[in-house]
């Protein structure tokens, strides 16, 4: 073998281990990426979260001009996150909260430090008070592969169609996969949406690895429960996010079931005391109480854990949500869309034959888990259940417009049919007597 050939082979053997070859995301740097917004519940604020690959200052510069100077500054903190995979990859998660924002005003911002800045993004500060009409995109189960709803969500976001996003669990498939590189890729994919709108979340079963560590580290939600459960107010609505996963991954602590349940009851009591101002109570949790899909998931069982609790009697949520008059319950997990008739304990409680969702006598359940992932869509059983109103086995997402304290408009958008509205329903409830279902 010639010296030249031997040297060339040695170089080729070293090449895969060269930091420059493995890609920019592996080489330590401080240019922000994976930028996303969230709302921590304090009026006039917005929180910016991003990732770098080396320590750096956490600063956001913001203003009102797209190309002009950004006169305002806000500073925050960064925390190292070490993924639980074998490579123990380290990310630096930065959080900065912008304050004293003018309600409804549009802002331009960039984040980073003198060592590296992001490009500029735009967002609209949430309006204060109860007398406005929030518009939300709602979906679950969106992966880094096959995220069918994402292109339309990007376009709708750019057109100013939404004030916030509710992602009802299951991200990336999975954020911990490939030593958390799949999580990185997913967070980059959603950036065109999440850097412009508060991207509000709840955990799903695909987040459970290493005790939900990627979920807890990457997102910034209200409260002090690491985003597992929290609530916030938006216009005439009180929105509650919670973890159905505490009922299934018991090795992370059975005490979490009771802890969350007590928190939920306390939060619902407070929400009902404020119900004149904010009549709507909306929940979001990943695994449904009911579903008519052709699989063996918990929601196909008559005594599902989320509905009835452990052993069919401990800390079930259906009785709790019914007791405090929850209006609307969003779920995902099933890779399909299903709207139920107003329901309690397997009985349909329509408002009337002609207008089932006008003054319904039970909560309305909507399963919206068809945003798109590698696991494809979930089929339904052939014959619809008597409590199932609409079933759609197509990729898409849900739009919710909370018009005022009495009227709410819900639509399902089909990506398979190029944005066609495949479900359209108004939920109407009177201002008075909201807590009790009669």
Curated annotation (Swiss-Prot):
Protein keywords: Glycoprotein, Hydrolase, Iron, Metal-binding, Secreted, Signal, Zinc
GO CC, alphabetical: extracellular region
Molecular function per GO: acid phosphatase activity; metal ion binding
Catalysed reactions, as listed in the record: a phosphate monoester + H2O = an alcohol + phosphate
Keyword Zinc: yes
Cofactor mode of binding and number, as noted: Binds 1 Fe cation per subunit.
Chief subcellular location: secreted
Glycosylation sites noted in the Swiss-Prot or TrEMBL record: 211, 350, 404
Cofactor: Fe cation; Zn(2+)
Localization per record: Secreted
Binding-site list for Zn(2+): 170, 205, 286, 333
Family note: Belongs to the metallophosphoesterase superfamily. Purple acid phosphatase family.
Protein's UniProt name: Acid phosphatase type 7
